[in-house]
Amino acid sequence: MNTFGRKLRLTTFGESHGNAIGGVIDGFPSGVKIDEKFIQAELDKRKPGGKFATARKENDKVQIFSGIFEGVSIGTPIGFIIFNENQKSKDYENIKNLFRPGHADFGYFKKFVIRDYRGGGRSSARETAVRVAAGAFAQILLNEFDICVQSGIFSIGSINKGGEISNAKNLKMDFDYAQTSEIFSLFKEFENEMKNEILNAKNAHDSVGGNVVTRVKNVPAGLGEVLYDKIDAKIAYALMGINGVKAVEIGAGVKASEMIGSENNDEILPFGKFKTNHSGGILGGITNGDEIIVKSHFKPTPSIFLAQNTIDESGAVKTLSLKGRHDPCIAVRGSVVATAMMRLIVADMMLLNLGSTLTSLKKFYL
């Protein structure tokens, strides 16, 4: 499906080399002052260009055409569009019948038979620009509650020097610095090594993967459901839906399976504070008021410029040599997308939580 969320719903449309991509946000509350400059600034973070991203030059100017009146949300669907301006479909003519290793081509062909081969069509990460715009709307709503969502690069390829994330309180991740870093690095001291890792892969006509950490500050306790809408399950669902994400860890993640209970448990201090944060701010599918900490693992960009073996639509063995413009490391711009998806999840869960108690219902209706 092309719709995400329960109370706050985002529906996206468009393909990589089509005329435009866009989205409709439904369920956004009325009365929220919309800062369009902030939305554009978030899109600019994800915008292609530069030596650490694809050379495809897109302005990514968002045009909002509904749901906003005199700069304020009016409670109706918010529609917006981003026109594609720099497609080079001819780069894909020679491979239109071939399946690119590491891409969704083969699966799309088996499912739909007809597919848009230009830049991957609907499966392209180009669509994530829409998610970033929608996530910016969600952050504007979250700002009303002083909730801050940020992401940054924790590691690139073999450059993984940030330490164990099992207890994020002990790590010196600088999320504010990451917003100014060319590659969104959480560690200023390791940034050049990470950059070199990307450039070395790029110069070898190859690519490299990376890890992104997302943090939510000032999130209230009590968000999430006890069974099938656990907020950690929703977060994993949202982040695994980003192109190239192969694994998601919350808090200590897989490291928790190596601990003993007395080590993994976060002792509770006065005023509802926690000594450690192995849980990543979530217990029993519900937030506990500590920071939400999540790590997303991105695979290397599948589009590389080395010859690869594959087959065509008839099953004949072929050799694939790609052209075009591709990110040497999708984790870099993926960090912006991870932020957007987390914003949408938290905002959705806050809206869902409104009817969880009789007290909250009475406050609204009486």
From Swiss-Prot:
One of its GO terms (molecular function) is FMN binding. One of its GO terms (cellular component) is cytosol. It is an enzyme of class 4 (lyase). Disulfide bonds: none annotated. Keywords: Amino-acid biosynthesis, Aromatic amino acid biosynthesis, FAD, Flavoprotein, FMN, Lyase, NADP. Its EC number is 4.2.3.5. NADP(+) binds at residue 46. It catalyses: 5-O-(1-carboxyvinyl)-3-phosphoshikimate = chorismate + phosphate. This reaction introduces a second double bond into the aromatic ring system. PANTHER family: CHORISMATE SYNTHASE. Homotetramer. Belongs to the chorismate synthase family. This is Chorismate synthase.
